[in-house]
C-alpha cells in the first residue's frame, strides 16, 4: 500500500477568533506568521461569514488525481459549520494552508 506519513508532537495550542470582515485564509495565514507557526494542524473551525468563495474538486484529464474547478461565490449570511486542515510551508518558508470547510447558506443548503 502506497502512502506518505509524518509524525509530530502536540506542542502549543492556540485559540483564534478572527474579527468580523476578516478573510478567513488570510487571517489564518497572518496568525501563523505572528505566532511563528511553520507546521501544524487546524483541529476545528466554526463561525458566521458575510460571504465565501470556494472551489470544488474536478477530474483533470491530463493529470492523475483531482484539481480544482472554477471559483464559486456565495453571498451571506453563511455559517461555517466545520473546518479542519493542515499548516505547512514551502521551500522559501511561506505559509501554506490546506483547509476543508463545510458551509451552510440561509436556505439550509450545504456547501
Residue ranges and their predicted role:
Residues 1-111:
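N-terminal intrinsically disordered, cationic/polar leader segments
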Amino acid at each position: 500500500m502506497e502512502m506518505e506519513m509524518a509524525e509530530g508532537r502536540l506542542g502549543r495550542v492556540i485559540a483564534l477568533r478572527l474579527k468580523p470582515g476578516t478573510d478567513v485564509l488570510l487571517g489564518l495565514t497572518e496568525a501563523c506568521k505572528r505566532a511563528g507557526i511553520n507546521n501544524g494542524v487546524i483541529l476545528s473551525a466554526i463561525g458566521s461569514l458575510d460571504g465565501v468563495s470556494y472551489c470544488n474538486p474536478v477530474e483533470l484529464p491530463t493529470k492523475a488525481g483531482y484539481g480544482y474547478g472554477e471559483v464559486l461565490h456565495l453571498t451571506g449570511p453563511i455559517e461555517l459549520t466545520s473546518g479542519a486542515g493542515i499548516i505547512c510551508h514551502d521551500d522559501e518558508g511561506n505559509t501554506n494552508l490546506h483547509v476543508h470547510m463545510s458551509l451552510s447558506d440561509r436556505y439550509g443548503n450545504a456547501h
